[in-house]
A protein has these predicted regions:
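An N-terminal, well-structured beta->alpha segment
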Residues: 1-68, 72-73, 152-184
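N-terminal small/polar loop signature for handling phosphorylated ligands or for N-terminal nucleophile
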Residues: 36, 40, 48-112, 199-258
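Short glycine-centered, acidic/aromatic-flanked micro-motifs in structured strand/loop junctions
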Residues: 52-53, 186-188, 259, 340, ...
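Proline/glycine-rich low-complexity loops and linkers
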Residues: 71, 131-164, 259-332, 337
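Gly/Ser/Thr-enriched, mixed-charge loops and adjacent short helices
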Residues: 13, 113-238
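Short beta-strand-to-turn element immediately C-terminal to the catalytic PLP-Schiff-base lysine
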Residues: 117-120, 256-260, 337-339
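Phosphate-binding and adjacent anionic-ligand microenvironments
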Residues: 244, 282-462
């Protein structure tokens, strides 16, 4: 049983003892701490907090505890019901609320759930803000409202407003999409994508077949949108008659595509392809995290923009995007952030922009994929003992490779070594005694060999 506390919220498995899992007592504690932080931060005059959730089986229970606690803290609750993460983020903006809580464990298995915390802009809390919430929770330093100041409760859907905001984006070419008469297969893994994506696709004139479309939270397969989990939709597309496949995770902030031949487009290339379309229409800068493909750098340079890398984590990417004045950014796991809409990963925005690009180019998805540089990312891990000084090891790696003239060393998040034609990124886990090793090259064999080489370097340093 697990309970993990981080700056972005808390996540854990359902059931078990208080303090060890995500259970009602801990939900009350962290919700109260968040409400206390919002009150003290005084960033908004609003007394309303938005609550949205994915379709997980435990979601109704968690939602009831969260909403009751917020009301007990004196906040009015705007419950938007079964909603995607980006819908909840936009609802905070549109309602000018004081903040928001998203109840979702994203791509984690069905027995997990989590509270993700938003500020008054509908964006994830900064590291300092997140640490403040954790400190308040540790001290249990909160005060509940008296009977005359208990919060009110309201339910309202924001799905249509989210869809309308996507359709209103200048680069979403609804006319071209409708004329293309696309037929798609969509895997929404038994969650909220099954509620909102049919409405979006109907508005775009796209014919569709849904797999795992019932939003019951009983995930038909591992919910992370990786090739190893997507045999069902890949087989469906291979039957023929489809222009592409669309895959989202349970809270619809990650997006993957499948080519018309049933092969993966590549989750790293979701952002790359959409950025290429955006940059071709509105030149500018881009940002992705350090573990994302170099293809975004190539595409950005092609269009005359500047690429900047950020530390892993959505809040780090959005912060860097604002600093760099980036017009698009995100993460290589299929997370697309388009500030013209909002500063959050949004699969609805990604779908609409991708279909616009495809409709205008009048090509097959596999042909579009072939226009981008070919890179492969290998993922490995180094298991360490709990007593290992991981920071000291990473510092040694930095010192060793910092002396080499053809290696660019970046240390804002672990250590990343950029070689002329490949890179490797070493990050320590915040929850386990391990170092994650990501490496990229022009072939998978070369990428894996580079990762294994750095793993041996680390082993030799112990």
């Amino acid at each position: 049983m697990t309970l993990i506390k981080s700056i972005s919220g808390i996540r854990g498995t359902i059931g078990g003892r208080a303090g060890d899992t995500l259970n009602p007592l801990d939900i009350v504690k962290f919700t109260s701490a968040y409400a206390t932080f919002i009150r003290r931060s005084n960033q908004s005059k609003s007394n309303t907090i938005v609550v949205g959730r994915d379709a997980r089986i435990s979601g109704e229970m968690v939602k009831n505890v969260v909403c009751g606690t917020l009301m007990g803290m004196g906040y009015d609750v705007l419950n938007i019901g079964l909603a995607t993460t980006p819908t909840t983020e936009l609802a905070v903006q549109m309602s000018q609320a004081a903040g928001g809580i998203i109840i979702t464990a994203s791509h984690n298995p069905r027995h997990w759930n989590a509270l993700k915390l938003l500020n008054h802009k509908g964006e994830f809390l900064t590291k300092d803000n997140g640490n403040e919430v954790l400190a308040i929770a540790d001290k249990e330093d909160f005060e509940f409202a008296d009977v005359d100041h208990v919060g009110k409760y309201k339910e309202e859907s924001f799905n249509q407003r989210h869809i309308d905001s996507v359709l209103a984006l200048k680069l979403v070419d609804t006319e071209a999409i409708r004329k293309a008469h696309f037929k798609v297969a969509v895997d929404v893994i038994n969650s909220v994508g099954g509620i909102i994506l049919p409405e979006l696709l109907d508005a775009l004139g796209v014919e569709y077949t849904f797999l795992n479309g019932e939003a019951n939270g009983d995930f038909a397969h591992n919910p992370e949108p990786l090739e190893k989990n997507l045999s069902g939709i890949m087989a469906e597309i291979r039957k023929g008659g489809y222009d592409l496949g669309i895959v989202v995770d349970p809270d619809v902030d990650r997006l993957a595509f499948i080519c018309e031949d049933g092969k993966m487009f590549g989750e790293e290339y979701t952002l790359v392809s959409i950025a290429d379309y955006v940059l071709s229409n509105t030149p500018g800068n881009t940002v992705s995290n350090l573990s994302s493909t170099r293809a975004l750098l190539d595409v950005t340079t092609k269009h005359g923009g500047v690429y900047t890398a950020a530390a892993v984590g959505e809040v780090n990417v959005t912060t860097k995007m604002k600093e760099a004045n980036a017009i698009i950014g995100g993460e290589g796991n299929g997370g697309v952030i388009y500030p013209e809409s909002h500063y959050g990963r949004d699969a609805l925005v990604g779908i609409a922009l991708f279909l616009s690009s495809l409709a205008q180019k009048k090509c097959k998805v596999s042909e579009l994929r072939a226009t981008f540089p070919e890179y492969f990312i290998a993922k490995n891990r180094i298991d360490l003992t709990p007593s290992t000084d991981v920071d000291a090891i990473l510092e040694k790696v930095k010192e060793q490779y910092g002396k080499e003239p053809d290696v660019q060393v970046t240390d804002i998040d672990g250590v990343k070594l950029d070689f002329p034609d490949k890179w490797v990124h070493l990050r320590k886990s915040n929850t386990e005694p391990i170092i994650r090793v990501y490496s990229e090259a022009s072939t998978m064999e070369e990428a894996d060999a580079l990762g294994k080489k750095l793993m041996q370097v680390v082993y030799d340093m112990q």
